[in-house]
């Protein structure tokens, strides 16, 4: 999907895929599935209020240069990639009993990048700048906020059906690891 967007600087470039393969036996079914995608979208998260006469105006990434001219940061974007893998196995053990199992793994990695004005140095773990013996406590900067995650696990169910009675026993075990961190790319 690609779009220039309705709101200024709100374009979208997204790609995705889906692949599935399987084995179908008399009493066995095995399927492998993978799907995922990437996206780069320019930020328009604030939307447009109904009172605003400029219906497509997007304030995100706006700053004023040293001459007081309005400028917009070119890479005010959200960038993310996620991939899923699944392996499913169903086995009919007899006419009354079947077993379903699945393994899954998801990998996600991405960031958003934005221009921030008048931010305190200490918010970003930076020492204040000293210019001509004057300590500056705030600055404009470009930052990235990252999401780096892994999620995997297994599920199962054992199903018994006989004499108008159905019983299911199942469970799952999952593990998630995620890290959120930031990077300062540029400071004025």
Explain the meaning of each model-derived region.
Residues 1-2, 8-44, 87-93:
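Transmembrane beta-barrel wall of Gram-negative outer-membrane proteins
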């Amino acid at each position: 999907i690609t779009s220039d967007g309705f709101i200024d600087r709100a374009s979208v470039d997204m790609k995705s895929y889906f692949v599935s393969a399987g084995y179908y036996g008399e009493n066995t079914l095995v399927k492998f599935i993978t799907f995922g995608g990437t996206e780069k979208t320019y930020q328009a998260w604030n939307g447009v209020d109904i009172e605003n006469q400029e219906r497509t105006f997007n304030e995100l990434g706006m700053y004023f240069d040293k001459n007081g001219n309005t400028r917009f940061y070119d890479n005010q974007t959200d960038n993310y990639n996620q991939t899923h893998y699944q392996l499913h196995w169903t086995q009919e053990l007899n006419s009354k009993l079947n077993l379903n199992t699945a393994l899954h793994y998801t990998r996600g990695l991405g960031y958003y990048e934005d221009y921030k004005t008048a931010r305190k140095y200490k918010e970003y773990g930076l020492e204040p700048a000293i210019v001509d013996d004057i300590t500056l406590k705030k600055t404009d900067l470009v930052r990235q906020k990252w999401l780096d995650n892994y999620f995997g696990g297994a599920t199962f169910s054992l199903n018994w059906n006989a004499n108008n009675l159905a019983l299911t026993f199942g469970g799952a075990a999952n593990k998630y690891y995620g890290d959120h961190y930031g990077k300062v790319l540029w400071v004025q």
